[in-house]
Regions:
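Single conserved hydrophobic/aromatic residue that forms the stacking wall/gate
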Residues: 1-7, 11
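Class I SAM-dependent methyltransferase SAM-binding "motif I" and its flanking Rossmann-like core
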Residues: 12-33
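Fold-independent oxyanion-binding glycine-rich loops
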Residues: 12-13, 78-80, 118-120, 137-140
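Non-transmembrane, aqueous-exposed alpha-helical and coiled segments at domain scale
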Residues: 106, 112-113, 168
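Zn-dependent metallopeptidase/amidohydrolase metal-coordination segment
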Residues: 121-153
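His/Asp/Glu-rich mid-to-C-terminal helical/loop segments that flank catalytic regions of hydrolases
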Residues: 144-168
Length: 168
């Protein structure tokens, strides 16, 4: 919902950018079964044109302190391309016009994808590879499917930042 905060609890971040694929130890910190299920569900098996998505678990202890009952929990897709990777059509059609519909309907062991943003999977993945704890909290400012947006989100973000800092 608009103005809600989305946290990934002990849930996951999914990177569409392929960033972690360039680092040693990637398979040790990623949820390979989730990745395989998602790629198969999306019909991307064998597609060498798409960066292999990776899935990172959030730090459970840190996220348990921050993501309380006032936050929506789920899987966040980090799609740095902003346009096509987030299902936005320009004057060029998407390679898979049902991409967002598939993403919305995807479920794996009770995990559902709740939102898109652009960099949290890289932050979570690199942190895990370096032995750090990290989590991110996103402010939902638009719902493209419902064609709703929160144009006055700046004040809400300040409140969310304060809430997260108090919970750390």
């Amino acid at each position: 919902p608009i103005k809600s905060s989305a946290a990934s609890d002990v849930y996951k971040r999914q990177g569409f950018d392929g960033l972690l694929n360039f680092y040693a130890g990637r398979n040790e910190v990623c949820d390979l079964d989730f990745e395989k299920a998602f790629i198969q569900y999306m019909g991307w098996t064998g597609n060498t044109c798409i960066a292999h998505p990776y899935v990172i678990d959030e730090d459970p202890e840190l996220t348990a302190r921050i993501a309380q009952t006032d936050m929506v929990k789920g899987v966040t897709i980090a799609a740095g391309g902003f346009f096509g990777p987030q299902g936005r059509e320009l004057r060029i059609p998407l390679a898979d016009p049902k991409q967002n519909e598939k993403i919305e309907n995807f479920e794996y062991k009770g995990y559902r994808i709740t939102n898109f943003e652009m960099e949290s999977s890289a932050l979570a993945g690199l942190s895990r590879l370096m032995g750090h704890k990290a989590t991110t909290v996103c402010m939902v400012i638009a719902n493209r499917l419902a064609k709703e947006a929160n144009s006055g989100y700046q004040n809400t973000i300040d409140t969310l930042i304060q809430k997260v800092l108090e919970r750390i």
